Amino acid sequence: MASPAVEIALSHIEAWSRHDWEKTRELLAPDVHATVTTTELGFRGGDLNGVDDYMERKMKAARLIEPGSVEVLSTVGDERNALVTVTFEIGLGPGGAMVTMARACLYLIDDHKKIKEERDAFFLLKK
């Protein structure tokens, strides 16, 4: 059985990857903060602050993901922290072609069982 933080993280990943925006928002603390980083040339990371900023950017990015393509590679966590690695298909290839993204997501869960902090690192797998 997964830890409480891993369960919340997996529910969140499932929600945004299937474009369930209500559930995605429901799992966020009001003052959520996320940082996205990558080693991919031509892509920039960024910081997302608060639910509205988070949802705006998450919805824009997640719309490029092929629903149902998320594959969970590994999870580890405890009551408040979760680390999840996943791959999924996303339309970031030439001309919007689907490519595989590898992503590591680190979460901090608050006392209300909401995502307070998220750290994402990603790269595109070369075939």
How would you name each of these model-derived features?
Residues 1-30, 127:
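Short, low-complexity N-terminal intrinsically disordered segments enriched in polar/charged residues
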Residues 1-6, 44-51, 100-103:
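Charged, low-complexity, helix/coiled-coil-prone segments
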Residues 4, 56-127:
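A beta-strand edge to alpha-helix "cap/lid" segment located at domain peripheries
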Residues 5, 13, 34, 40, ...:
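N-terminal/domain-start segments enriched in small and hydrophobic, helix-friendly residues
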Residues 9, 13-16, 28, 36, ...:
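Hydrophobic alpha-helical core bundles mediating ligand binding, dimerization, or RNAP-core interactions
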Residues 12, 24, 32, 51-54, ...:
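Hydrophobic pocket/interface hotspot
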Residues 17, 21, 51-58, 100:
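A structural signal for well-ordered alpha-helical scaffolds and beta->alpha junctions
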Residues 26-79:
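A solvent-exposed, acidic/Ser-Thr-rich amphipathic alpha-helical stretch
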